[in-house]
Design a protein with these regions (language model features):
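Class I S-adenosyl-L-methionine
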Residues: 1-105, 109
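Beta-strand/loop-alpha-helix module characteristic of Rossmann-like adenine-cofactor folds
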Residues: 2-5, 116-267
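Short alpha-helices
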Residues: 83, 93-95, 104, 110-125, ...
Length: 267
């Protein structure tokens, strides 16, 4: 049995009760933190909280050579852990399909997603979001300006009046994920002000909404023009950015109240 368990958004307590029970019942637990990570905890704290040893896998050990995970699941109850919800990433869907091809029974225990939290914290209605996109670090996509994948997604959503959730790039070495070292060489998180600065070059007058540390005790939500957000400071990671489309009157009220949106942004 291979059980995919979403750990939620922030720390060792963000997991659901169902996920906690499944993890504690597993014979063996694997995790990966390169697609996303829990900035409010460490692997050591997760292990202590759940009284379960956790083996952290490198990217190659999940995407290219998952044999150890699959072989273990053929004979034992294995838990595979990720931040957020495990089935948001194509990598994890692929791992599940590989397991099923080998006759391994699979199960999914969902966790809270960043998209659900962004909608809840901002008051932007979930069904009014279009396709999401990821904004990489400038050095990561090897070209000047914004990647076409980002601009095309935002443009298509805006044409339809839909909001765009922009995931911001992270680079986390497994050593940092385990120790939460804070070493700049081991972990790097794009901030919302940096992302707003990138987007301002193409969308100088567009509004934006920052969501920082969703799932933590002290989340930050702020709405303004992207050029204004580019000069802001929103505290520690993880950050998300939303580029709103057309706003329902309840969404306008929510942004004014929950995100301190200036009146001129909502006209």
């Amino acid at each position: 049995m291979l059980t995919f368990i979403g750990l939620g958004l922030y720390d060792e307590r963000s997991i659901t009760v169902e996920g906690r029970d499944a993890l504690r019942a597993a014979d063996r637990a694997f995790a990966e933190f390169y697609t996303s990570t829990l900035v409010g905890t460490t692997v050591e704290a997760l292990e202590a909280f759940h009284d379960t040893p956790i083996e952290v896998r490198e990217r190659a050990g999940v995407e290219q050579d998952p044999e150890e995970v699959l072989a273990a699941a053929e004979n034992d109850d294995v838990a595979f852990l990720t931040a957020g919800d495990t089935m948001i990433s194509t990598t994890h869907v692929d791992l599940r399909l590989r397991a099923r091809d080998r006759g391994v029974e699979t199960r999914v225990v969902h966790g809270t997603t960043a998209q659900a939290a962004a909608s809840a914290l901002t008051g932007l209605q979930n069904y009014r979001f279009g396709e999401a996109t990821t904004l990489p670090f400038a050095y990561a996509h090897g070209a000047d300006g914004l990647p076409a994948s980002v601009t095309e997604t935002i443009d298509e959503n805006r044409e339809r009046g839909l909001h765009t959730l922009v995931y911001l790039d992270i680079k986390v070495d497994n050593e940092a994920a385990v120790a939460r070292a804070g070493d700049e060489e081991l972990e790097e998180y794009m901030t919302a002000d940096t992302a707003a600065g990138y987007l301002t070059e193409t969308y100088p007058d567009a509004p934006g909404v920052v969501v920082a540390r969703a799932g933590s005790p002290d989340p930050t939500v702020a709405a303004d023009r992207l050029e204004a957000l580019a000069d802001g400071a929103f505290g520690g990671p993880l950050h998300l950015l939303v580029v709103p489309g057309d706003l329902h009157h309840v969404e306008r009220d929510a942004l004014a109240d929950l995100a301190d949106a200036p009146a001129e942004l909502l006209d």
